Curated annotation (Swiss-Prot):
GO terms for molecular function: ATP binding; P-type potassium transmembrane transporter activity. Its main location: membrane. Part of the high-affinity ATP-driven potassium transport (or Kdp) system, which catalyzes the hydrolysis of ATP coupled with the electrogenic transport of potassium into the cytoplasm. This subunit acts as a catalytic chaperone that increases the ATP-binding affinity of the ATP-hydrolyzing subunit KdpB by the formation of a transient KdpB/KdpC/ATP ternary complex. Keywords: ATP-binding, Cell inner membrane, Cell membrane, Ion transport, Membrane, Nucleotide-binding, Potassium, Potassium transport, Transmembrane, Transmembrane helix, Transport. Pfam families: KdpC. It comes from the Bacteria. It is a single-pass membrane protein. This is Potassium-transporting ATPase KdpC subunit. InterPro entries: KdpC.
Amino acid sequence: MMTHLRPALASLLALSLLTGVAYPLALTGIAAVIAPDRAAGSLILREGQVVGSALIGQGFEGPGYLHPRPSASDWNAAGTSASNLGPTSAALLAQVQERQAAYEAQNGASAPVDAVTASGSGLDPHVSPANARAQAGRIARARGLEEAAVRRLIEAHVEPPLLGLWGQARVNVLAVNLALDAAGA
């Protein structure tokens, strides 16, 4: 029996070290050299302090801020999840209708789909350009800015589809909100 057990345990140990230690460390090291900011989580710093990540959404609720998509996990990255409500769910319909009414009351514009539906992860850092533009008036009024200035700031933060082909144009909510704060209003 030991003749079979010893090679099996040696293989288990060797493969565990290779796939559980060496491989992850090698990839982390390569990533740190090739794309150090992305390897560290695409963290955004202000005055030496981490204020968020470009890849993980966070909630903003004040009228002077660009609001993100709804989150099924209440912006908890450790508990990220979708709502798991099906497309025929009465509870989902009620949530969407409630969000739509609130959005339209706050912004005076019809709600784009991404303003009333949570993403699969619940932590999308982006909204559609249409969603961001629809919020410009509310943000401008709350901050005492001209709506055109807020729209220019939003347009400056529109990210195109990857290589112009994949995905959709999008606006990073945290980047816009930090730019609004930096504008001083």
